[in-house]
């Protein structure tokens, strides 16, 4: 069986946001992703970062195809809801991370199609909600969900 590559790109996203002079914040290690930021996230992950990995794999002699979780409805996402527990006041507070998501369902059909053609899938962890919204998904979370769906 061929490998399936799921990649992140936090430093590359940060670099592009800086170049575009878009401020970014993190809460508990998660990037708050507003409307301007999600466009940059998708551009960097699905574009530059994904294609540089595809190029590296091709240069090693293997065939690969770069996709995102939106392609083939691979990752249907939902908004990630985080709750901050303030231990001093014992009060829970909802944290709005914007367009940060988590996988709701995985349809690995597109992955199986690529593997059947002897191509390594290279996946950017960007998903789409049932509402049509694009969501930024943590790469480790996406990789775990994809692995479970493939029974790997």
Describe the predicted segments one by one.
Residues 1-152:
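Nucleotide/pyrophosphate-binding catalytic subdomain
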């Amino acid at each position: 069986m061929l490998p399936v590559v799921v990649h992140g790109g936090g430093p590359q996203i940060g670099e592009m946001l800086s170049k575009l002079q878009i401020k970014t914040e993190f809460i508990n290690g998660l990037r708050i992703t507003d409307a301007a930021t999600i466009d940059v996230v998708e551009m960097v992950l699905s574009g530059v970062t994904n294609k540089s990995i595809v190029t590296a794999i091709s240069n090693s002699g293997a065939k690969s195809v770069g996709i995102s979780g939106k392609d083939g409805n691979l990752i249907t996402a939902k908004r990630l809801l985080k709750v901050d527990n303030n231990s001093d006041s014992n009060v829970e507070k909802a944290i709005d991370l914007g367009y940060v998501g988590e996988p709701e369902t995985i349809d690995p059909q597109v992955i199986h199609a690529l593997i059947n053609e002897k191509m390594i899938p290279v996946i950017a962890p960007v998903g789409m909600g049932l509402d049509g919204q694009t969501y930024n998904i943590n790469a480790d979370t996406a990789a775990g969900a994809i692995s479970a769906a493939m029974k790997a």
